[in-house]
């Protein structure tokens, strides 16, 4: 298969079809079904987080190049919107098959650019693939509604029709999953899509474009541009882009929501989080501690649904030393090496910020019971590594609690009752996810009913729903009306047209020929 030839030498695992052949390869744009070299003079160096060696140079696309992508999308929309829903379904059926057969190539690229372990990178791809698989059900997902005989001889029905050109702005932490939340739903509904992947991790998106070509998607239906702030402004301001999807930080999400919304666009923004896990003393101790460690430190804590805050209720606070021992045993190393539990964080700046937030906890009176800030990884001394870190005796006014750390750091608070735990979580401005660990059904039911968070797990540490549901973060974690994927995702990418028609029964044409002599009455 052609795709297998797109992977560079094993020491680099760098995608070649999407890059030039320079000594330091450059990432190309994807315009009108082709990989195109940018003519910009402004480039961003992309570093391997495990070594800080330059992997590729990413262009800050020019205004003309980005406008070319829009023109390509506009042109493709004219025919794509008229394509049958069955033909769009066929593209998704082929795409999911191609992705599944090439998960390891995608995972290698993600590990090289983002740093997460290979097994975690495959999970990144799989969760995105599940959205593609759900899009294969578009023939039932995009159905409208009908009421016959709403009045005498009158029927009313509605269509769910595409919007036009849409755009997705993706983050660095899920290089495959988040773009796959965006463009498959958009184009299966009949839209065209422009994707701006994170300038830190564009490779997975470029691989997906190669796969999309192989699946038979027409040129221009999906285009890819690159850049930073100027590219975001272009997407928010361009009058031909009808809707914008974004996943990322609070600051960027609020900015995009306000700017794109001011320009009349439909916008959905998934933003920051402070996800709490509540540990009851009646929980299954071994299972709970294992799940806490995995959810807090997996992907080096760089998940929007990472369980970054533990709330120990009553005697459960005595479990913290056992949790520390489990976390201490996790292996920190380069993501491509066997046995690695967590790799590096994305950049030296991220590492510095994480370390500063940990230090702020100590200065404010918390205890660092496991300190991973000075970890050394043999052979990767220049990497952005932070080991599992646990801070206990944290209070809600501390900076390490109020800010999203986005690293392998678990902050631990203690309360006496479930009511105090619920109040603590509801007072936090974020509402992405939360979990409770208990064997008591009544306690779990109370928690589910009283908690004001969009996604709740009961003995499930990271309750991200499968795509037949929607990703329903709330409060400070989301801006918009319709959430990502699932039924709400279809609603976001479509507009409703309602038709009311009147055909009077008295106007029905005769169904048999009149053979009697005409009398001219």
Swiss-Prot record:
Cellular compartment(s): Mitochondrion
A molecular function annotated in GO for this UniProt entry is:
malonate-semialdehyde dehydrogenase (acetylating) activity
Recorded GO cellular component terms are: mitochondrion
Q: Which residues form a coiled coil?
A: none
Enzymatic reactions? 2-methyl-3-oxopropanoate + NAD(+) + CoA + H2O = propanoyl-CoA + hydrogencarbonate + NADH + H(+); 3-oxopropanoate + NAD(+) + CoA + H2O = hydrogencarbonate + acetyl-CoA + NADH + H(+)
Which Gene Ontology BP terms does the record give? thymine catabolic process; valine catabolic process
Catalytic class of the enzyme: oxidoreductase
Where's it mainly located? mitochondrion
**List of residues binding NAD(+):** 170, 172, 196, 199-200, 249, 404
Q: Does this UniProt record's set of keywords contain Oxidoreductase?
A: yes
Active site as annotated: 304
State which Enzyme Commission number(s) the record gives: 1.2.1.27
Which UniProt keywords are listed? Answer: Mitochondrion, NAD, Oxidoreductase, Transit peptide
Q: Name one Pfam family in it.
A: Aldedh
Keyword Transit peptide assigned to the entry: answer is yes
Question: Which PANTHER family is this protein grouped with?
Answer: MALONATE-SEMIALDEHYDE DEHYDROGENASE, METHYLMALONATE-SEMIALDEHYDE DEHYDROGENASE [ACYLATING], MITOCHONDRIAL
Record's subunit section: Homotetramer.
**Which function does this protein serve?**
Probable malonate and methylmalonate semialdehyde dehydrogenase involved in the catabolism of valine, thymine, and compounds catabolized by way of beta-alanine, including uracil and cytidine.
Q: Which family does it belong to?
A: Belongs to the aldehyde dehydrogenase family.
Which protein is depicted? Answer: Probable methylmalonate-semialdehyde/malonate-semialdehyde dehydrogenase [acylating], mitochondrial
Q: Which organism is it from?
A: Anopheles gambiae
């Amino acid at each position: 298969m052609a795709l297998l030839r797109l992977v560079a030498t094993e020491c680099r695992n760098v995608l070649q079809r999407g890059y030039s052949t320079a000594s330091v390869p450059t990432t190309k744009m994807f315009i009108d079904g082709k990989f195109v070299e940018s003519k910009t003079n402004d480039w961003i160096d992309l570093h391997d987080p495990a070594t800080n060696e330059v992997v590729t140079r990413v262009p800050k696309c020019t205004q003309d190049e980005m406008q070319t992508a829009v023109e390509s999308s506009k042109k493709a929309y004219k025919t794509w919107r008229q394509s049958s829903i069955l033909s769009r379904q066929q593209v998704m059926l082929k795409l999911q098959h191609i992705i599944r057969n090439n998960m390891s190539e995608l995972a290698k690229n993600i590990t090289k650019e983002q740093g997460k372990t290979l097994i975690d990178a495959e999970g990144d791809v799989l969760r995105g693939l599940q959205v593609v698989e759900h899009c294969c059900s578009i023939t039932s997902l995009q159905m409208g509604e009908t009421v016959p005989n709403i009045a005498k001889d009158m029927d009313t029905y509605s269509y769910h029709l595409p919007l036009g050109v849409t755009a997705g702005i993706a983050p660095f932490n899920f290089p495959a999953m988040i773009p796959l939340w965006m463009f498959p739903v958009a184009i299966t509904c009949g839209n065209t899509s422009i994707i701006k992947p994170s300038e830190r991790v564009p490779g997975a998106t470029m691989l997906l474009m190669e796969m999309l070509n192989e699946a038979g998607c027409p040129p221009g239906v999906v285009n890819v541009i690159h850049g930073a702030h100027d590219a975001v402004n272009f997407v928010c301001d361009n009058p031909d882009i009808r809707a914008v999807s974004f996943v990322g930080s609070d600051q960027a999400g609020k900015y995009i929501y306000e700017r794109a919304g001011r320009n009349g666009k439909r916008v959905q923004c998934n933003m920051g989080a402070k996800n709490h896990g509540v540990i009851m003393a009646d929980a299954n101790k071994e299972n709970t501690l294992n799940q806490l460690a995995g959810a807090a430190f997996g992907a080096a804590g760089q998940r929007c649904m990472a369980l970054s805050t533990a709330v120990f209720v009553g005697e459960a606070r005595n479990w913290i030393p056992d949790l520390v021992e489990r976390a201490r045993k996790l292996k920190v190393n380069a993501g491509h090496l066997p046995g690695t539990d967590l790799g590096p964080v994305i950049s030296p700046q991220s590492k510095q910020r994480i370390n500063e937030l940990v230090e702020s906890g100590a200065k404010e009176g918390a205890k660092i019971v496991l300190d991973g800030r000075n970890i050394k990884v043999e052979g990767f001394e220049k990497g952005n590594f932070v080991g599992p870190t646990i801070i206990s005796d944290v209070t809600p006014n501390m900076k390490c609690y109020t800010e999203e750390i986005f690293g392998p750091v678990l902050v631990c608070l203690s309360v006496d009752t479930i009511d105090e735990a619920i109040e603590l979580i509801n007072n936090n401005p974020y509402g992405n996810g939360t979990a409770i660990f208990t064997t008591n059904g009544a306690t779990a039911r109370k928690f589910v009913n009283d908690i004001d968070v969009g996604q709740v797990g009961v003995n499930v540490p990271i309750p991200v729903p499968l795509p037949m549901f929607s990703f329903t973060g709330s409060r400070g974690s989301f801006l918009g009306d319709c959430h990502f994927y699932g039924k709400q995702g279809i609603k976001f990418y479509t507009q409703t047209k309602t038709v009311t028609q009147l055909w009077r029964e008295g106007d029905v044409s005769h169904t048999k020929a009149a053979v009697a002599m005409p009398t001219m009455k």
